[in-house]
């Protein structure tokens, strides 16, 4: 999984430029030779108009509306529900997965607050 933020660090690395640790993106150039190499467990995306935040893994998509999910959450198993019709967030059987994603989202939102624009 990759993010658009990975483009600049990757192009910089391919050009032989030094890594900039203040950037949020990651160098994914190794994936050009090793397609199965992973650089991140989940891809992160933001929908500003809806104040939504997405974490996407290979099998799962988690969407949180509002900084703490106060406006709702959605959880989809994209392997069995690729069109994301069935929200599993309220299902007790999926509570551990939902909790894991909520923890990941809290950590991700805290990490992006300390971004390259502040340095």
Predicted regions and their residues:
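Soluble non-cytosolic domains of exported or imported proteins
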Residues: 2, 92-95
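Phosphate-coordinating loops and pocket residues in cytosolic domains that bind phosphorylated ligands
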Residues: 87-90
């Amino acid at each position: 999984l990759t993010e658009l933020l990975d483009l600049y660090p990757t192009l910089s690395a391919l050009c032989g430029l030094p890594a900039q640790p203040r950037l949020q993106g990651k160098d994914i150039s190794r994936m050009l030779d090793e397609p199965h190499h992973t650089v991140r467990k989940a891809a992160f995306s933001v929908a500003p108009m809806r104040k939504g935040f997405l974490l996407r893994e290979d099998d799962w998509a988690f969407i949180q509306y509002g900084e703490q999910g106060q406006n709702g959450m959605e959880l989809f198993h994209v392997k069995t529900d690729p069109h994301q019709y069935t929200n599993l967030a309220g299902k007790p059987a999926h509570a551990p997965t939902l909790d894991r994603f909520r923890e990941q989202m809290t950590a991700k939102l805290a990490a992006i607050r300390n971004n390259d624009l502040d340095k």
